[in-house]
Design a protein with these regions (language model features):
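N-terminal, Lys/Arg-enriched amphipathic/low-complexity engagement segments
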Residues: 1-47
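Gly-rich Lys/Arg/Thr-decorated short loops/hinges at beta-loop-alpha junctions or inter-strand turns
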Residues: 140, 163-177, 298
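Hydrophobic alpha-helical positions that pack around
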Residues: 201-313, 319-324, 334
């Protein structure tokens, strides 16, 4: 019997329209907009000025603390401005704009290996591996964008026992990880070995949902050459890509409220991050591009693109046939955890796993009705929370009750809103309350 996590969960329609599409190369845009805060933690500090010439891989913003990440130029060109632009969350954030040099061959920084030759051997010490990952600006590519070098540096007294690779991709519509697994399986397995070496662990488990049988077969065949690494097929269930849910599915361990995965002896890394680690350590290549799914039921050409960081999302949408006439919303990410985007000028960042074009009929909110106390939201919550009560407490600004209801444990998967027969915007209220309670907790600690 296939494993899955044991608490809550739902089965929304998968709609993996681009599942069989190979990764396509995307033409370069005329300019890129590269935010300096594409990660959890402190924004990077710009190291370039207006008028500076940059190459692919030039560092344009450096870390401003331990929990931060370097930012590199994804193109050859000239810095035209450093200004504030809207991000995927609707906030104005500083970004560096680079006009792409036209009509000339791209210039890359020296030392970057652009070949596709597989490099298996890695003799670096753990600290050297982590330093290379940090220098390359690698962050979690599953959406959380937590700096990878921090994850590979457990706090004193904590010891990793197993590395879990998150290749679940449970979010409907998105197929970028699936496409990457099919095209870069050998590199991913080498990346797993590099991370095992960095953490000092002998065991790794690659968790893949059973709707990706081709990826499971391919990875399993290659994994036979790597002792201590196994591929674990998992039952299809949302939100299995959550760290705590994946740890429960793979290890049968539950991470306590407020605790980190390392408390269960686990470090979890997204499969896209693993490939980026391979490129950083074996090819000296910084994180300047990622695989992004562009999809939607009425989109002419749903695809998986290799997109340079900073590329306006409109450039990707145009490559997929342009916006359909009945477009209602453009979502950054998937339908469950993604956010509506304000403009097609918003750039691809390190965390942009997908761009979803929803038709009007699927993007119009239905009228909210009174809660009928059916408890469906409680049943499906993978964190064991009571979303209905949390929404009520947020409405009344009862922050004490909200905190006692463990609102900060919410992983914002949206299962509660999805299943609510009264169309109540549970997640919207919980997100608001979570921000407020988190701010109150930080204020108490300071």
């Amino acid at each position: 019997m296939l494993r899955t996590f044991r608490l809550g969960g739902i089965h929304p329609p998968e709609n993996k329209l681009s599942a069989k599409r190979p990764i396509e190369e995307l033409p370069l845009p005329r300019e890129v907009i590269i935010p300096i805060g594409q990660h959890i933690g402190a924004p990077a500090t710009p190291t370039v000025q207006k008028g500076d010439l940059v190459k692919v891989g030039t560092i344009i913003a450096k870390t401003s603390g331990f929990v931060s990440a370097n930012i590199h130029s994804s193109v050859t060109g000239k810095v035209t401005k450093i200004d504030s632009f809207f991000d995927a969350g609707g906030y104005k954030r500083p970004a560096i704009v680079i006009a792409v040099t036209q009509g000339e061959e791209e210039q890359w920084e020296e030392g970057i290996d652009r070949s596709t030759t597989l490099v298996k051997e890695c003799t670096l010490e753990p600290k050297e591996i982590i330093d290379r990952i940090s220098a390359a600006g690698i962050v979690g590519l599953g959406g959380a964008t937590f700096p990878t070098h921090v994850k590979l540096s457990p706090p004193p007294g904590a010891k990793a026992e197993v590395l879990i690779i998150n290749a679940v991709e449970c979010e409907p519509y998105l197929t970028s990880d699936h496409a990457l697994m099919m095209s870069k399986s050998d590199e991913i397995l080498v990346g797993v070995e590099i991370l095992k070496r960095a953490l000092g662990v002998s065991r790794a488990v690659i968790g893949v949902e059973n709707n990706k049988k081709d990826a499971i077969l391919r990875l399993s065949q290659i994994a036979m050459d790597y002792p201590g690494t196994e591929v674990m097929p998992l039952k299809v269930q949302y939100p299995q890509g959550g760290e705590k849910q994946l740890i429960d599915a793979v290890l049968r361990k539950q991470v306590k409220s407020g605790a980190l995965p390392i408390s269960a002896g686990a470090v979890v890394q997204n499969v896209g991050t693993v490939f980026a680690v391979y490129e950083a350590v074996q090819k000296n290549k910084p994180l300047i591009e990622r695989i992004t799914t562009v999809t939607g039921k009425h989109l002419e050409n749903p695809s998986n693109y290799r997109a340079r960081i900073g590329t306006p999302i409109g450039h990707l949408i145009t490559a997929s046939g342009g916006l359909p006439e009945d477009t209602g919303k453009i979502i950054g990410g998937g339908p469950m955890m993604g956010k509506a985007l304000l403009s097609t000028e918003i750039p691809v960042t390190k965390g942009t796993s997908g761009i979803l074009i929803l038709p009007r009929e699927e993007s119009t909110r239905r009228p909210m009705r009174n809660c009928i106390r059916c408890a469906k939201c409680v049943t499906v919550c993978p964190m064991g929370l009571n979303p209905a009560f949390l929404m009520r407490d947020v409405q009344y600004a009862d922050w004490d009750a909200t905190e006692k209801g463990y609102i900060v444990d919410c992983i914002e998967c949206g299962s509660c809103s999805y299943t609510c027969p009264a169309n109540r915007p549970l997640l919207d209220y919980i997100r608001t309350g979570k921000q407020k309670v988190s701010a109150l907790i930080r204020a108490r600690k300071s």
